[in-house]
Amino acid sequence: MDDLTQVKVKADGHVATVTMDNPPVNALSRTMNDELTLALDRISETDEIRVVVLTAAGKVFCAGADLKGRAENIKGPGDFMAHNRRTRECFHAIRECAKPVVCAINGAALGSGLAMAASSDVLIASEKASLGLPEVDVGLLGGCRHAMRLFSHSRLRRMALTGMRVDGAELYRLGVVEACVPPEALMPKALEIARTIASKSPVSTRMGKHTLNVIEDMSLRDGYRYEQDMTAQIGKTDDAREAQRAFAEKRAPVFTGR
């Protein structure tokens, strides 16, 4: 994906590392927004890639919206709605990516950065990471609906109404992230988890992520019924049969993604 300028994509085996690179603070510019959406859409349709690691270059994961660029892009009728549509589709591209997304939060993830993390599947934080909703300080509203998936009622409202940040250690204590590690250990830990996921049947992980997304907004009864229906579909795949044969034969399975 050499045609991208603010997003770098590097594939290693079945894992693709997607790195946001828009100095100095990886603000979500229109270019980075569109390139991140495009990169994830391409990865969704690339069979060789089974897992994504989403991270950022530099000391900041994403400082939020590019306010200067926002003003330049919103000048006439329809511009504001188009801007909002592009922004939300960027987050949906993460959540709806056919491949699981491991988010390696290397620094502050604020506003849009928090929404990106919340849209991912597995979150890992550096000791220098933090999540926050600073929009109240600039007369805007943040991604509170995304943050609701991570934080309790009181903590979310405190963050939204005061602009407070939650650091990596506290994120781990709250169970928001799977681990809080020294900066130099962040990518090794994220890649370790990604490679473990990549070793599983790509059919199961793809359909599993889709199912988790769908049942999140369902009742217990409807959600579990849907999960059972999806389990029946997965059970008919070649990968499911291979997994069962491998288990019986006490060997590692060889998955084909079918």
Protein language model annotation of sequence segments:
Residues 1-57, 92:
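Conserved CoA-thioester-binding segment of acyl-CoA-metabolizing enzymes
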Residues 39, 86-97:
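Catalytic-core regions built around general acid/base machinery
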Residues 92-205, 236-237, 241-245:
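Crotonase-fold acyl-CoA enzyme core
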Residues 1-13, 22, 47, 163-169, ...:
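C-terminal alpha-helix plus adjacent terminal tail
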Residues 8, 35, 56-90, 109, ...:
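Glycine- (often His-adjacent) and acidic-residue-rich active-site loop
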